[in-house]
Amino acid sequence: IEHLANVRGSSCYFIDLDPRFVKKLISNKQFDVAKQYMVHVVDQAATILPHRKVSGLFTTPKLLEALGEKVNLWDAGIRGVFCGGTSMKPQEIRFIIEELLENRIGFYPTYGNTLMGLAASVELQPEDNFSATYFAPQPRAVLRVVNPKQTDETVGYGEWGRVELTTLTKEFFMPRFLERDETIRRAARPPYAWDGVGDVRPFGALEKTIVEGVY
């Protein structure tokens, strides 16, 4: 992000965040401390916005909601929000677009990690009902949605399965790595000619409680 901003003649401002610390606090039921930490992080962002020209924001859903309660993002100059780092249900995406961003600020859900890179989402259409679909950056990364009990089987379109990642770069090859995520297999959609994944969430989210922390 910083490199891209610099190439385009802009600056990039970072707020340090320790999600593992927050997850530990929540697991230990120290909710008041976790809340204080989130407020501390959001306050730093709110301090930067009035004094710098910032139009693009990269953040997580919970932090975006907290920041939106503190400042008017449009008036602060934000024109596009890239949001990821955790699962986002369709109703959460709808709330962000219609309430937080007031249908005026561009919203771009993202999914990814260090091994895959960034899987971009396609523009939401009315028929999507606010369900985001992501496409891996092929050919360096390929996603497959597999039967978690028989991982050599690919599930059908519209079905839930576990995310399988294959990464191939000049320096690194990692075939068929099972991610800690589950998702719906989605069909190809312009401008992408390969399968996508939708409604990504932690693997086993319906069977057990999973702490995602401030993410």
Model-assigned labels for residue ranges:
Residues 2-11:
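Conserved short alpha-helical elements in the N-terminal third of ANL/AMP-binding
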Residues 10-215:
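Active-site glycine/GP-rich loop and adjacent strand/helix microenvironment
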